Amino acid sequence: MSNTLKKDETFKGLDLNKNQKEEKPAKLPALSKRADVIKVSDFNFFYKGKKQALFNINMEIKENSITTFIGPSGCGKSTLLRSINRMNDLISGSSVEGSIEVFNEEIYKQGTDVSKLRTEVGMVFQKANPFPLSIYENVVYGPKTQGVKSKKILDQICEDSLRKAALWEEVKDKLETPALGLSGGQQQRLCIARAIAMHPKILLMDEPTSALDPIATLKVEELVLELKKEYTIVMVTHSLQQATRISDMTAYFLKGELIEYNTTKKIFINPKDSRTEDYISGRYGD
């Protein structure tokens, strides 16, 4: 399979005549009735020299849900997050055991199209990282690399993505200005728009608000709650308050192990493991 997606595969079905004020998706079914879109089975991750970072991780993540990974620094939560779209492949000497399935496809099997995987599973990093290009070129950069040349289609992708990232109204009159001139919160929402522009099905977010002020953090959280209607979201956060505000499910990690995974309400109100209780009550810090 080619590592370059044809534009008809990723961007097919675009309606260039549609009203940009799209109807909101129907109300989501109960969490228990949603399909599993990510399944992690007996997953182990090793850095160079066989230094083990994750130990026998098992979990399933539902579609159109927000799952937060919490735990002290170095507990493995970001390592697992980056394993879901194989970003850790970029770490020299790393290796894995076990499996991760995304939409019932084992992503670590030989012959996996990693480029296609990373299109379907987008990534938003801790620090906003807009390219030193215009706002417009930041958003359409990915589609262009996948072969989209039509200005009309690129314009639509740009507007749709910025609208979904709750940024369109703030930047629609300055799309050709440098993205680096935006505020920190706007830059992070631009990076979310850039990820959305690739038409992913899953969004991975690695502490996306850690560098933002409280107002910008609130805007991103409101955006994430809205995006859940269309995407499955997995987020690493150091903020327990953030986890309680936005997530459906929470996973607590400690020293590379998944200690407890349950609905966010149960994790924070009635944890089953004393180590989880120690962490959320502040008796075990970072």
From Swiss-Prot:
The complex is composed of two ATP-binding proteins (PstB), two transmembrane proteins (PstC and PstA) and a solute-binding protein (PstS). Part of the ABC transporter complex PstSACB involved in phosphate import. Responsible for energy coupling to the transport system. It is a peripheral membrane protein. PANTHER family: ABC TRANSPORTER I FAMILY MEMBER 17. It comes from Mesoplasma florum (strain ATCC 33453 / NBRC 100688 / NCTC 11704 / L1) (Acholeplasma florum). It holds the Pfam family ABC_tran. Its EC number is 7.3.2.1. GO terms for biological process: phosphate ion transmembrane transport. It catalyses: phosphate(out) + ATP + H2O = ADP + 2 phosphate(in) + H(+). GO terms for cellular component: plasma membrane. Residues 38-280 form the ABC transporter domain. Belongs to the ABC transporter superfamily. Phosphate importer (TC 3.A.1.7) family. It is found in: Cell membrane. Keywords: ATP-binding, Cell membrane, Membrane, Nucleotide-binding, Phosphate transport, Translocase, Transport. Gene3D superfamilies: P-loop containing nucleotide triphosphate hydrolases. This is Phosphate import ATP-binding protein PstB. It is an enzyme of class 7 (translocase). GO terms for molecular function: ATP binding; ATP hydrolysis activity; ATPase-coupled phosphate ion transmembrane transporter activity. ATP binds at residues 71-78.
